[in-house]
Amino acid sequence: MKLVAILEDDAASGGGYNQALNAILQMRDLCAGRYEFEVLTTRLSNIGVLRSLNVQAEAFAYSIADKLLSYLSPAPWWHPLQVRLRLVGPFERMLRRRGCDLVYFVTPTARPNMLQGLNFIATVWDLCHRDTPEFPEVRESAVFQAREHSYRTILPQAFAIMTDSAALAGAISRRYGIDAERLLPMPFAPAPSLSAASSTDKATVLSKYGLQEGYFFYPAQFWAHKNHIRILQALVQLKARGQAVSVAFAGGDQGNRRHVETFVAANALRDQVRLLGFVPAEDMRGLYEGCRAVVMPTYFGPTNMPPLEAWLIGKPLIYSSQFREQAGEAALCVDPDDADALARAMQACSDDEICAALVRAGAARLRQIEQQRKEAEAELLARLRQFEAKRSCWP
């Protein structure tokens, strides 16, 4: 049996890209000695990244015909016509020529709607367009409608659906009527690029960005839902109390950076706030190592990667209270609406005993999640074996 993983994102996509890399590495290891496994990517830049992780990949591009199939997929009349005409797009024909039995889309995507006959594994990271539909990134440009159509048409067809948590799996089942046995919660893991061997040393990184140790660190792209503003409001409160702490934001602009910059200027925070922009993977470990604590008051979840990475590096974590299921006792959990609560949590991180307790709890929580991942991997392998048995029933 042969599986083919499809990677459509690149490093500029943020944390989701690292999770996609983890998914590829995980499936490669599960398939070793059991099944054939290939990786195809739509981004040439991924070839070198994957090679550095000992994964061989090939680049491809969706054809105009493939994109047309994807464009037509929302139309209720299209699929019956496609079946009647036996139309199979170039993407699926290419996969069949390669002997592919099961396609693994390692990021959320509407591309499974291109497939006429091949089975696939889908990925869902969140349902935040339903949880918090007021944010512009899911409210504007028909994103909400596109996600709803994608999930309603793709998920019922999937052989398996990879999610990041039991909470998300339950929400998918409840909202879209998906059978629970089709869903497989697979906990996230820290980014593979955070290993010391592939990272630039802390001193070099801090010098590069002009940072002094002891800042609060938020690795997140500038989306509205990332809630950078609440951190800045907390800085204003702390400054009024005579505590001028600093924060470093690392992430590309997704339309909300100017809003953050305007607030920084209006509240005289330029000396306390560093906007680092997109940071290459090899610098991330050094930025984590140099911080006092990681702060993440995001509205989107139910899980995120920076908490895992804070625990891996051994840093205290301040996290949104609605995602306590991921954090357990390993974070100071605050209401992301409440700047005062966030300021108090940041102030608490000046206490070495509190920080040490959070670091110990983080290490323990990471071990728990790693055990959950091992159990989920065993379940994934069992499901692949079930698919293999069924796949033997046709040529």
Residue ranges of model-derived segments:
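Carbohydrate transferase catalytic cores enriched for Leloir-type hexosyltransferases
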Residues: 1-395
